[in-house]
Amino acid sequence: MAELMLLSEIADPTRFFTDNLLSPEDWGLQNSTLYSGLDEVAEEQTQLFRCPEQDVPFDGSSLDVGMDVSPSEPPWELLPIFPDLQVKSEPSSPCSSSSLSSESSRLSTEPSSEALGVGEVLHVKTESLAPPLCLLGDDPTSSFETVQINVIPTSDDSSDVQTKIEPVSPCSSVNSEASLLSADSSSQAFIGEEVLEVKTESLSPSGCLLWDVPAPSLGAVQISMGPSLDGSSGKALPTRKPPLQPKPVVLTTVPMPSRAVPPSTTVLLQSLVQPPPVSPVVLIQGAIRVQPEGPAPSLPRPERKSIVPAPMPGNSCPPEVDAKLLKRQQRMIKNRESACQSRRKKKEYLQGLEARLQAVLADNQQLRRENAALRRRLEALLAENSELKLGSGNRKVVCIMVFLLFIAFNFGPVSISEPPSAPISPRMNKGEPQPRRHLLGFSEQEPVQGVEPLQGSSQGPKEPQPSPTDQPSFSNLTAFPGGAKELLLRDLDQLFLSSDCRHFNRTESLRLADELSGWVQRHQRGRRKIPQRAQERQKSQPRKKSPPVKAVPIQPPGPPERDSVGQLQLYRHPDRSQPAFLDAIDRREDTFYVVSFRRDHLLLPAISHNKTSRPKMSLVMPAMAPNETLSGRGAPGDYEEMMQIECEVMDTRVIHIKTSTVPPSLRKQPSPTPGNATGGPLPVSAASQAHQASHQPLYLNHP
């Protein structure tokens, strides 16, 4: 048996290499037709090839192949008639025409060397017309197609005819279409002639659709030798017109059964070019000449051979391999395209990432600067806030301290050192105890010596009198030195006068002033009736309009000790009074004064005190009514007439009076006896009661 080898290519395999990377320009719009053409071939390749179950003989009426034997000696006489032919069809390289011829010669010598016997090589040359237009490249090659047939005899009287068919021209593309063998195309084989001329009509493509490299022809011509059905010579076998279909690069082995009649062979020609249905069809007639390589011996008798196209494959047996190869090539192209696109996308993505990174870095730097500025501003604000907090705290503390100090100076107790006192009498230096105040009293048994009746008003000028060298010192805790005392007094006067502005009745004020003046005058007249007094007392009570009377300081220290019983006596010679004494008591014209040098006084403290008003003080002293009938009390011995003066304490202070300024009548006093307000002696019961009252807690007397 013989094998039928089919080989077809749709593209040059040398075009693709491992290091052949397509540039982005290769995937432009100019190569879109190549991809569309490959896709169409992939879709139609399953319909182009079919595996026939049996060989279909061609009749001479269907295929008219004329073969003219030009040489004088036919090449078929010396060669045995082989029933099978092995045809190998390969496209030539589209590089140059020299490569075509070299490839043809190389392929033609290979089967001859493998033959078992002496063989001859038949060259079949097919000529075709040039296409009207070629769009593939700049160097269109020749349009001739050379078919080389090698006929090699075998040991079992079987000859294999190897035929190499080269493509007509590199301008033929995938879209080229071959028409069926018509009646115009004829193939005649003459036994007696050495030259076998095969006249075929082939289609020429209208134009090449590839741009860069012209693709080889996809068509292939298959020539097979088979036994002739009829033994008559000189008549061509009836053949039919099979379509020429394209076939990818594939090596197909088709077993051919041996025929019983060896003299008759059948040559089948099959074109594997399938053009698109819309492309124009151009018929090209070419003559195929088979020439022997060596001298061909003459044959005893000519035999007729019919060249018929090979049967079309019906099933999808060979296309399975072809489809894989085509898909692999398409995958290769798509992979390269996708790789290029992925690289381009990756590059664009990286460029976008770099741009975004630069923008983010710029924003980050700007945010860092803003953050630093805000941090500095925050630190400045915190420092300022801390300073303000400390300042406000100090300010609050200072305000509170000033307020507390003001309260302490105005309402709290003040301890101020007292000024230097006057010279102390020798009796005080001897350590005699200072007498205390007690109730005033008069004694009738001991008349007062050297007392003159009071003449004139108490408001007149005083007569200067000599004073002894010794004088007691008065002091208390509220004494002030020098100018500070006067300033504090003025401030206190302003404070009390401004805070207590009471409204008073003018008529009532005049009535009180007149009553006090009358009391002083009556007391002075009553004192004139007394011839002599046991002690000299001096009392100065000026006449003024304002009702309040200044009180004598409480518990004055240090005068000479006197009798516990004494008599109240007014100053009787205002004309001879000393100005030094009046200046010592700081006499004012609008104030009544009650001056007493006695130590016996009954002092009753206040049980409660109203903090919203000044402290009040009531003075109760002996007084005499204008006449006894006005008193309304009956006999003078039953009742004591007393003058009660209600006043508010404006100020208390300690004054120092020199002993020399005190009138002589008031300096030395005998032991007084208790008496009444009119100068009369007090009853013994009253004196004893006064002495007993000194032991009570509400009385202050001499110890």
From Swiss-Prot:
One of its GO terms (molecular function) is sequence-specific double-stranded DNA binding. Residues 89-114, 685-696 have a biased composition (Low complexity). Its main location: endoplasmic reticulum. Residues 522-531 have a biased composition (Basic residues). One of its GO terms (cellular component) is cytosol. Residues 418-703 are lumenal. Residues 2-86 are annotated as: Transcription activation. The basic domain functions as a nuclear localization signal. This is Cyclic AMP-dependent transcription factor ATF-6 beta. It comes from Homo sapiens. The gene is ATF6B.
